[in-house]
From Swiss-Prot:
A cellular component term, taken from the record's GO annotations: host cell nucleus
Location of this chain's protein in the cell: Virion; Host nucleus
This protein's UniProt keywords: Capsid protein, Disulfide bond, Host nucleus, Host-virus interaction, Late protein, T=7 icosahedral capsid protein, Viral attachment to host cell, Viral penetration into host cytoplasm, Virion, Virus endocytosis by host, Virus entry into host cell
Positions with biased composition (Basic residues): 485-494
Function, in words: Forms an icosahedral capsid with a T=7 symmetry and a 50 nm diameter. The capsid is composed of 72 pentamers linked to each other by disulfide bonds and associated with L2 proteins. Binds to heparan sulfate proteoglycans on cell surface of basal layer keratinocytes to provide initial virion attachment. This binding mediates a conformational change in the virus capsid that facilitates efficient infection. The virion enters the host cell via endocytosis. During virus trafficking, L1 protein dissociates from the viral DNA and the genomic DNA is released to the host nucleus.
MF-aspect GO terms: structural molecule activity
Protein name (database record): Major capsid protein L1
Region (Disordered): 475-494
A Pfam family matched in the record: Late_protein_L1
Highest taxon in the source lineage: Viruses
Summary of subunit composition and partner proteins: Self-assembles into homopentamers. The capsid has an icosahedral symmetry and consists of 72 capsomers, with each capsomer being a pentamer of L1. Interacts with the minor capsid protein L2; this interaction is necessary for viral genome encapsidation. Interacts with protein E2; this interaction enhances E2-dependent replication and transcription activation.
Main location: virion
Length: 494
């Protein structure tokens, strides 16, 4: 093919065609049949800073994420009110999320944390303070209230978090002992119990804080994650995030300087030396202690309903795997109980700290409620081919498959596969594995807790009122437009 172009110009060809992602509204039919589901009161109790394996006490911190994996019943095995609703030979049923309310109990309380040996050498904001000479161990006890975060995110798959961690160096560029390692931005699914960012950054603190003194106790040897909103927004399907709501606030309460050998010196062209060098041992590695400030009910994201009319991705709330992932981050109720117990059974008559044992506990209280709509998917050749491309596991659950190419190799099938007379048969391939079996979630089973009587539940009544329907048992029906066939005599005046 001959192509003419001006001298020195580049010739650009169009990119290769890609598979277009379709909106679920183009092949998922809404039925206007709604169900309500809710949980019991969900409670969790544990130590706010670390877990105690000897007594099987978990770590339950107000600065942790709570990720609920909500299991829904299979609508294709559901007892439907109308048998003519769909044809099982040509259609399959799915759930779509329409409403959600995450309710939280317990009073508001600022989250307080700290470290009994925090890496703070000296006060860096008070210019008149007398500086002490650096020693081998300048750590001090420090407590603080941390960055305040409220976050609610719902999707069909786990939310994606981001954090900074050590990177693999290039070949031949291995850092020497004591050098700063290369770092990179990493991603991982947000699991139940992962730590939020509380004002120190989203980092892998097991690698970044090897002196165990740079961050509060509940961050030691753990990762603090921040939801990767950019990556989830770029996902065309949007399965990991149908929608989210968040509220963050933080300010710096105090500024300190860190202790340690500073190997990255200030360039000489950035400062002038003092005539009397009295600050040769000062540290320029500054850090600020965060504070979330006032906690009030004015800015609460919880205990209120959310309605999903249009998701941020092309999956408009369809739960293909009959499950939902609700990710919650809320440290506005991060109060810690202090429990004092005498060392013996006698009632103390005067205060003596040596005769009292002190314990810490943190408690959390949740309740979830959802509004689901029943939807149908017609099993056309185009729809099956598209689902085979974007979500083949759905067709496997529906027992709908694309015919594989004819086998060219004769395979062997043994009878009595558990017999010792034959070779070992691999049984793991036949068993269906959970794709999230290595992740930790708070499993919630709603497979037997759905109800069509929406007016019997608070969220259901709000949904009915949102659509202009009263809570009366009698449903309003549209007026009949059929003309009357009764012949009436016409009155004539004489």
């Amino acid at each position: 093919m001959a192509v003419w172009q001006q001298q020195g110009q580049r010739l650009y060809f169009p990119p290769n065609p890609v598979t277009k992602v379709l909106c679920t509204e183009s092949y998922v039919k809404r039925t206007s049949i709604f169900y309500h589901g809710e949980t019991e009161r969900l409670l969790t109790v544990g130590h706010p800073y670390w877990k105690i394996p000897e007594q099987n006490i978990p770590k339950v911190s107000g600065n942790q994420y709570r990720v609920f994996r909500v299991q829904l019943p299979d609508p294709n095995q559901f007892a439907l009110p109308d048998k003519n609703l769909h044809n099982p030979a040509k259609e399959r049923l799915v759930w779509a999320i329409l409403g959600l309310q995450v309710s939280r109990g317990q009073p508001l309380g600022a989250p307080v944390t700290g470290n009994q040996l925090f890496n703070v050498w000296t006060d860096a904001e008070n210019v008149t303070a007398k500086r002490a000479l650096p020693g081998s161990d300048d750590r001090k006890q420090l407590g603080m209230d941390v960055k305040q975060t409220q976050m609610l995110l719902i999707g069909q798959s786990p939310a994606i978090g981001e954090y900074w961690g050590k990177a693999i160096p290039c070949e031949g560029k291995q850092p020497k002992a004591g050098d700063c390692p290369p770092i990179e931005l990493k991603n991982k699914p947000i699991e139940d119990g992962d730590m939020m960012d509380i004002g120190f950054g989203a980092c892998d603190w097991k690698d970044f804080s090897q002196n165990l003194s740079d961050v509060p106790l509940d961050l030691i040897n753990s990762k603090s994650l921040y939801p990767d909103y950019l990556k989830m927004a770029e996902d065309s399907l949007g399965n990991s995030c149908f929608f989210y709501a968040r509220r963050e606030q933080v300010y710096v309460r105090h500024v300190y300087s860190r202790g340690g050998e500073q190997k990255e010196a200030i360039p000489k062209d950035m400062t002038l030396p003092q005539q009397v060098p009295d600050n040769k041992d000062t540290s320029f590695t500054f850090m600020g202690t965060p504070s979330g400030s006032l906690v009030s009910t004015d800015g609460q994201l919880f205990n209120r309903p959310y309605w999903l009319y249009q998701a941020q991705g092309l999956n408009n709330g369809v739960c293909w795997d009959n499950e939902l992932f609700i990710t919650v981050g809320d440290n506005s109720r991060g109060g810690v109980f202090t429990i004092s117990v005498p060392v013996d059974d006698r009632k103390p008559e005067q205060y003596n700290s040596a005769n009292m044992n002190i314990y810490c506990r943190h408690v959390e209280e949740y309740k979830l409620a959802v509004i689901l709509e029943l939807c149908s998917v017609e099993l056309t050749s185009e729809t099956v081919a598209y689902l085979q491309t974007v979500n083949p596991s759905v067709l496997e659950k529906w027992e709908v498959g694309v015919n594989p190419p004819p086998a060219t190799v004769l395979e062997d099938t043994y009878r009595y596969q558990e017999s010792k007379a034959i070779k070992c048969i691999d049984q793991t391939a036949a068993a269906k594995k959970d794709k999230y079996e290595n992740l930790s979630f708070w499993n919630i089973d709603l497979r037997e807790k759905l109800s069509a009587d929406l007016d019997q539940y608070p969220l259901g009544r709000r949904f009915l009122a949102q659509n202009g329907i009263t809570c009366s048992r009698k449903r309003l029906r549209p007026a009949s437009t059929k003309k009357s066939t009764t012949n009436k005599k016409r009155k004539t005046s004489r």
